[in-house]
Amino acid sequence: MFTKLATKMFGSKNAREIKRMRKVVTRINELEEQFGALSDTELQGKTAEFRRRLDEGEALDSLLPEVFATVREASRRVMGMRHYDVQLIGGMTLHEGRIAEMKTGEGKTLVATAAVYLNALPGKGVHVVTVNDYLARRDAEWMGKLYRFLGMQVGVVASGQPPEEKRAAYQADITYGTNNEFGFDYLRDNMAFSIEDKVQRGLNFAIVDEVDSILIDEARTPLIISGAAEDSSKLYQAVNALVPSLEKGEVSEEGESSGDFTIDEKSRQVELTESGHEKVEDLLLGQGLLKEGESLYSAANLSLLHHVHSALRAHHLFQKDVDYIVQGGQVVIVDEHTGRTMPGRRWSEGLHQAIEAKEGLKIQAESQTLASTTFQNYFRLYDKLAGMTGTADTEAFEFRQIYGLDVVVIPPNKPIQRIDYNDLVYLTQEEKFHAIIDEIKDVTAEGRPILVGTASIEASELLSMLLKKARIDHKILNAKQHESEALIIAQAGRPGAVTIATNMAGRGTDIVLGGNWEYEVAALDNPSEEEVARMKAEWTERHNQVLDAGGLHIIGTERHESRRIDNQLRGRAGRQGDPGSSRFFLSLEDNLMRIFAPERVKNLMQAMGMKKGEAIEHRMVTNAIEKSQRKVEGRNFDMRKTLLEYDDVANDQRTVIYEQRNEVMASNDISEMIDTIREDVVDSVVSEFIPPQSMPEQWDVQGLEAQLQSEMAIELPIQQWLKDDNKLYEDNLRQKILDAIVAEYKAKEEVAGSEAMRKFEKQVFLQVLDTLWKEHLSNMDHLRRGIHLRGYAQKNPKQEYKREAFNLFETMLDTMKRDVTRVLCHVRVQSQEEMAEIERRRKEELEREMARAKLRHEQASAAQAEGEGDDGQQGQQATPETFVRQERKVGRNEPCPCGSGKKYKQCCGKVS
């Protein structure tokens, strides 16, 4: 109540922000006449002037009015498009590092130009992130004319580009590309052999188009570069053959389970019942996969249990043409949010292989992670991040909490005239689809175009079949027609046109009422002026006809899990003040209604005694459905937040390793770091056999000599030293051993030459670090997938994960120090030629690895987000050795035992 009263008195925060920015727009408008009087050369000279003023210490913000006036005038001259006032407000929002919510058709592509140009002036680069390669190329070509006119360089990054092209694109002032490509280039750069092999420069400023799609819908799906691991295709096929023998059961209200397994559709998980467990054991025994007397739940057979669960999920929870399609002998995932296919992506936890076995396809080998990150952590690396979309306000809390981004709702240039009708709810899907066909007939009879949004490919093809039966001409747009997508959506506004689209396929292309005449002109070879004029006149007639009839009508065939995706579908109508309308048709058999809608909605409809073909239309029902959606959105947010909390642990470690790697690559001399590492390792080895503050009787001198020969390749007569000098105490002995090892190393360096040795040290450090980091990622995956079991021991899985991950990381760093020292002490470096040969071989190995590697934007299942499931790869994981500490562990914040006076973590506890 008080909040509403305060908002009424002082206006909402959003309204105050818009009011503040309108004052700046007034200043930009005052400059319009002055900048309009400049010649092209004078206008183009503004870029050099702005850069000079920045060099002299002027702030970007103080340049903003003049810069925006320059871009507006240049856009008017080059593209014939003048920025509206609200588009300038959108540009300011982006410059301030926030999200601009602008309705469909408000010209988001043009909005970005002013902010992009302003932030490109310092010369640190601006990344414009789009959802697909087509939009990246289109926008770079379209808006590139404006930027090039103003003297800016524009680049595009795409998959499959040679490194030289990519490097040039990243060196440009403005770089366009997809979220996947930017993310994978970041990972590849951190696997690079040298600084020269990297393609990206610093991550300065990114503007993310369709920011909700990239930062929210795809946030649960990590970017992974992986290499092939061991083949287990026969096991998948054998387990797949068992599934038809198992009977699906139900869980009664008393909690009793029938059948062999039960399904939880909310969490998309399966659970074996007691009888099912016994039946599976008998079947596995018959196939020779389980030995007599062994249990399916024993530690050795957990991977087998995982295979059974994956096969059951593949058969009963994942449907062909809904969750995936089979194309070219491969299972291709269909994005649940956009309806687009996602070639190259694979489900994790062995689920993808189980689906391949179900469909009788060749089973692709499981893989080992070489490098990974999430979009959440990648985009948080930018110094400044901004985004734009038509629908962000429903997710404003998540943008604020995870990315620190505020959402500003930009008012439309013209008031929205679209009418959003209440939902119509039917008892069955059959009745719902018949009602949709009737609605299509009625609306097209008025000469209005219709866009029908479906949630799956299966639904779009079923509707298409019904329309064919009714002899209604239509176009279908789903994941199977990527290439013709833009053309179909551009012509969806013609009078009487019927277009079926899965979710938001075709996003990024406007539906122009009357059709898009520019696309028709572009399809002709050298059209004459008369033809162009005729086509424009025909379009004007069609455009007016559709306007008079009431504009575009949107039909939603079911509600999505997110209100935002429903709003995106509605937003296709009523662009730029055009008339339009929308209505959703639902049934009690729809997924959202069946799984999440409250029982009272179903009971209410049945109590009303509804007859076949009748629908209920009431605001109460619509509100109840929206409440269900909010419940699902909250659940999905919790899952994304959980994933982020776990990935933050890995991200801290990733940051340390990548910073260390970059530091080593950028340096020509890491000898000081190597000396420190050697000293730590020698100290650690000596402590194993001569415990600190111990009596000589407790020393294992013979064991120490053997260990030094094994690890340091040096024979030291320590027993003889002790006989010759009875005053050789522990500290002096440690120093004498270290001096002898250093002297041996220096002698080796004199033979090879200092320059060759410096290069070799650098190569060895990077090679050891890369190998151990890959093993560490496998160990982290393994830990992550089993950590939820700690909950059964009344322990907090997240805290346990942090603790275990830190121990794994410490062990990895200790191992790295030992391995680097061991290799450097054992290898004899002879010449510069030998060094060049080692470098060449390592480069070739990295190239082979990258050629074999797969880039996966892996579809994380609900189980993964919750920390459930096991990947069935125990045999492939590099299990960390138990590290036995002979002395009290020094805390990271305690004084360093070396006596330097610094904290341990800032002294000997540091890698370098």
From Swiss-Prot:
* Top-rank taxon: Bacteria
Family matches, as Gene3D superfamilies = Helical scaffold and wing domains of SecA, P-loop containing nucleotide triphosphate hydrolases, SecA, preprotein cross-linking domain
Q: Where does ATP bind?
A: Q87, G105, E106, G107, K108, T109, D510
Enzyme Commission number? 7.4.2.8
Q: Where is this region: Disordered?
A: 854-912
UniProt source species: Marinobacter nauticus (strain ATCC 700491 / DSM 11845 / VT8)
The UniProt function text for this chain reads:
Part of the Sec protein translocase complex. Interacts with the SecYEG preprotein conducting channel. Has a central role in coupling the hydrolysis of ATP to the transfer of proteins into and across the cell membrane, serving both as a receptor for the preprotein-SecB complex and as an ATP-driven molecular motor driving the stepwise translocation of polypeptide chains across the membrane.
User: What Pfam families does the database record attribute to this sequence?
Assistant: P-loop_SecA, SEC-C, SecA_DEAD, SecA_PP_bind, SecA_SW
Q: Which GO terms describe its cellular component?
A: cell envelope Sec protein transport complex; cytosol; plasma membrane
The protein's topology relative to the membrane is: Peripheral membrane protein
Q: What is this protein called?
A: Protein translocase subunit SecA
